[in-house]
């Protein structure tokens, strides 16, 4: 039944796209997508030997606007994988999607960006330095195979929904249930953004629990500064009842000049009944960002991790993060 519903939704998108394509065409246009994240890092104290240059991640792709609201995009993600030695890099297809926008409605299908923490990541604004909270602590994936829709009811209210496989873009499965998500974004006044999201990731095994995710966010961008905070709850990690994770993140930045930003962030991750105590932590990152022309950014930053495991020592790292992209 679920497969039929998904197929019907995909066919509806395809039929609407066909109708749009038959209308008077606009001049097509495209652009390359190139983003490279790298760094030099060095630890202090117990991490003194953890130092070196690192090519963290590269995104290579192309986006093409066909006209009449129709757009296609393909992006390759080249980065680290937990499945192989840390020195190796694996290439994945992160996005292979087609989207159609008409009026206040936008439909997207294929290997698409998810809606779980997309807004928080954009507001944080320093993805090449560190992932946003939910991505950093593996509350969900940034892309997956499925369909999504968003509708702008008013200038201050937009809602979105998504149905995807639920395993992310690195593990494209088809037999382990689906993930459903629903979100709403409010912008009641200029500069102020609020968002709430709920997601349910089905388990194909009746003896195991469904995963659930609740995310809330509020942020304000003013002239030359921004500040935001988010609270996240992730229930039944690994489809195990009681394996709940929760935490919050606070981040902000100040524009010191046209080419210089000052930024800081505090994360706090906890687990129910301390089941994840070995990885629970609070963490701080702070630093500067310098823009060297249009395509290059350099960001020296200091990081401190404070584990919640009893008798565990704090860890300190210094980074020089680098970005190239257009």
Model-derived features: where do they sit?
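Cleavable N-terminal export/targeting peptides
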Residues: 1-25
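Structural motif marking the loop-to-transmembrane transition
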Residues: 2-3, 180, 184
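Conserved long hydrophobic alpha-helices within structured protein cores
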Residues: 9-10, 154, 257-260
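Alpha-helical transmembrane segments and their juxtamembrane interfaces
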Residues: 12-14, 78, 304
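Outer membrane beta-barrel
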Residues: 23-166, 176-178, 185-194, 263
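Outer-membrane beta-barrel pore domains
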Residues: 26-28, 33, 37-49, 84-88, ...
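Short, electropositive, low-hydrophobicity segments enriched in small/polar residues
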Residues: 114, 170, 291
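Active-site cleft segment of glycoside hydrolase catalytic domains centered on the general acid/base Glu
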Residues: 171-175
